[in-house]
Each structure stands twice: as structure tokens, then as C-alpha cells.
Amino acid sequence: MSIRVRFAPSPTGPLHIGGARSALFNWLYARHHGGQFLVRIEDTDMERSSRESEENILNALRWLGIDWDEGIEVGGPNGPYRQTERLDIYRQLAKELVDAGHAYYCYCSEEELAVEREALMEKGELPRYLGRCRNLCPEDKAKFEAEGKKPVLRFRVPENQTITINDHVRGQVEFESNGIGDFIIMKSDNIPTYNFAVVVDDHDMGITHVVRAEEHLSNTPRQILIYEALGWQKPEFAHISLILGKDRSKMSKRHGATSIEQYHNLGYLPEALVNFLALLGWSPGGEEEIFTLKEIKEQFTLDRVAKNPAVFDIDKLNWLNGHYIRQASVERLTKLAVPYLQGAGYLKEEISTEKMAWLEQVVAIARNYISYMQEITQHVDVFFRDNVEITEEDAKQVQGWEQMPVVMKAAHELFSAANELTEESVKAIIKAIGKQTGLKGKFIFQPLRVGITGQTHGPELHQIIPVIGKERTLARLEAALK
């Protein structure tokens, strides 16, 4: 059997972490087994759906490196791939269910249903539809139609039936049909509900495995009943765990960024996010946590997907992203850094080839101190400012501040005499400052760092000074002496 899986987002907003993980797991499963991955759009919520959100979702998938073999924008033999373009298909199949006695029209008002729900809950029973319109006579139907009531279409759930799901993640799960109630498959505006449309789409598109979030498990018995009523073969199911915040509550905006677009805008790298998402509920075994997409694809199986909820740990994501930042090419990182530096006011003019080469030196140093690219603006001020302002109070926080004038004077003299400043020549000059002043260790480094950078901590001086350049280094030393 050739594996066919799908990702079917609703375009009512950006692609969120949970949706991205579902898409990734489906993609990995297809690629691991040499199958096909399909993307379609579930846009029957017409008030909230938009083409802008659809484009955002598709762009987020592409950015993560998730491609698809069939579906929206790609085409294929099983389209259309938007639900709003498939309405006639659902309506025809709904009619067939009515004709076969598997569905019926319901004229109950919201008020009547609310009273019914409340009565069931007071008795400690699950709220469900009790079938008031199950066996309406033609006269009652005609009366309701004459009153202008628009019916919904309900599926007639068989009584006393055990519905068994052999789930790849959850194992065997059973539901009793008596606890489900006759559910709506077509709304009063003749638009299909999720449970009906998803069955029709999965069947028409030849989906063999449905890999989705655990929250859909309760929908599965309803969908299985529709498959059986239409005489269709059911796909296999795998319901992956929920994603929780570090406080073990369901992940939400209060836990930080929740959409892929937000992480993209903050300057996370797609390979880091994919690595992180893959580990939200899946593990290949062992202690290793850093994997390329190719490695994950080769190892991914559903039997390694955990039942327990996955915890979204932003510290772990930051650690992973920091690792990938330090592995990435400086050229790539510099291009990513430019918009953040422009936004912070560090880059105002057009960037020349010479300036870009200098920026690469800045980024090569700063990347060692950041978890995502937006943070780079917090670590580059020392390279861009013309002058360093040091108050006497700041100077007094430095070990050996009394010797600061001596160190500044010796440094100015030795840096002035240097032909060029490289990491090696700066190391030699700092050593020479020690010999000339008779000072050692922190009594040289701290005054020198504060004098040149205005900071007490940061990258090694032999890395910073060549990038600042001779002219600005001397100017800062002169300012410090004053």
C-alpha cells in the first residue's frame, strides 16, 4: 500500500505551532515510507477564512522546508483542494445519505436544543441530541417548512454499537454509539460540517493514514460511522499528543509566540524550528537532540510518538536555535541580521560591498551571544558608536581603575604605532601594555575594555578591536584619558 497523508488547515489565521507539528509529522511519515503528502484547505468557515491566511500558512510550510506532492497550488487528479470549491460534492453525498435512511432533517431551534442539553447535564449525562426529529411525519415537515424553518441535516447514529479505533499512537480506543447522539453533517445554509467534509475529502483523495492532534480523537467515531454508512474503507488513525506550556496548561499566547510567522520574524532559523518541532512528542531514542531534516526523515516512525503531552520549552528552542546560528555561514546570518540592524537605526545608508564585509565581521562575533537573530541588536552597539562615554562612577566599578590613565596612555602609544590591527597583533599589543605598565590580568583587561567599549563584559578584546578599527580605537582611548 502506498502511503498517502495530508495536512488540512483552516485559513482563519497564521500557522500555529501545533498545526506546524502536525504538518511536519505527516510530511515525515510520507517521506520515510516513500509515500505522498497532500495539502488541502478547509475553508467552510467563510466568515473567518481568508486568502491572506491561506497564503500565510503555505508560506510558513515552505519556509520550514515542508513541500507537498499534491493539493493546493500544486494540483493533482483529486481536486478541487479547497472545500468551498467542493460544495456540490458534499451536497450530493448528503442527499444519498438521506435517501438511504442514514440522515434526516432536523428543525429544532437553538432554544429547544439548549433546554435539552441543560436537562441532560442536570442528570449527569453527556449533552447530546436525543433524536426529536428522527421520525418526523411528512405533515410535520411541511408545517415546519411553511413556518420558514431552515433545517440542518443530522446523521442517524445507530444504537448500541461499539466503535473501535486501533490508533497508531493511542492503541485500541472504544466509543459507545449511545453516548454520541445524532450529529449535524450539513448546516442550515447547506454548508457541510467538519466531520462530514473531512470524511468525503479523505476518501476522494485516497488518504490512507490520518495523523492529527489528540483533540480530534473524539470526532473519530462520528467519522467512522460516516465511512461505514457510505460503504467506504476507513483510513488508519494516529492521534498525536497535545502541546502544553511549561506550566503544563494548554499552550496559548501567554506562553510566548505561538505562530510560525512570529518565530520567523524574531529570527529563528527554520532548521532549528523543525528540529524542535520533531522532538515535540517524537523521539528516536538515545540522548541526541540535534538532527538534520534528513536524519529525522530517515528515523521517523509512528511507534516512537509518545502518548503523553509534549511540553513546549522555549529555553530548549533557544538553545537549539543558538546552536544552528553558530553552525550557519556568516554570509547567511549577515543577510538575516541586516533588517534588524536597520530597524534599530544602526544601518541608515545603502550597504556597500565593503560595508557588508565589515558587517560579516560584526556578525561573526555577535552570533556567539544570541539565541535568535533579533537579539543581535543588543550586542553590536560597541561596533557602531563613534564615542564611548565613561563616567568616573563607571570607572570606579573596574578593578584597577586607579591605573586606568596609565593603561590608556600605554595602549594609545602602542596602538598608534601598529601598522594594522589583527587578532594576533592586538594580543601582542595587550601583552606589551603589561610589560610597559608592570600590570597583569584584570588590571589591564578591565580598564582597557571599559575604555574602548564602555562595557565591563563582552567578547574578547582581540576580537573586538580589529573590527572597531585603529582610528576609532585611538579616538576612544583619547576620550578615556580625558
Curated annotation (Swiss-Prot):
Motif ('HIGH' region): 9-19
Source organism per UniProt: Desulforamulus reducens (strain ATCC BAA-1160 / DSM 100696 / MI-1) (Desulfotomaculum reducens)
NCBIfam families in alphabetical order: gltX_bact
Subunit details: Monomer.
Protein's name in the database: Glutamate--tRNA ligase
Main localization of the protein described in the UniProt heading: cytoplasm
Record localization: Cytoplasm
Superkingdom to which the source organism belongs: Bacteria
EC nos: 6.1.1.17
Motif 'KMSKS' region boundaries: 250-254
Functional note: Catalyzes the attachment of glutamate to tRNA(Glu) in a two-step reaction: glutamate is first activated by ATP to form Glu-AMP and then transferred to the acceptor end of tRNA(Glu).
Record keyword Transmembrane helix present: no
Record-stated family: Belongs to the class-I aminoacyl-tRNA synthetase family. Glutamate--tRNA ligase type 1 subfamily.
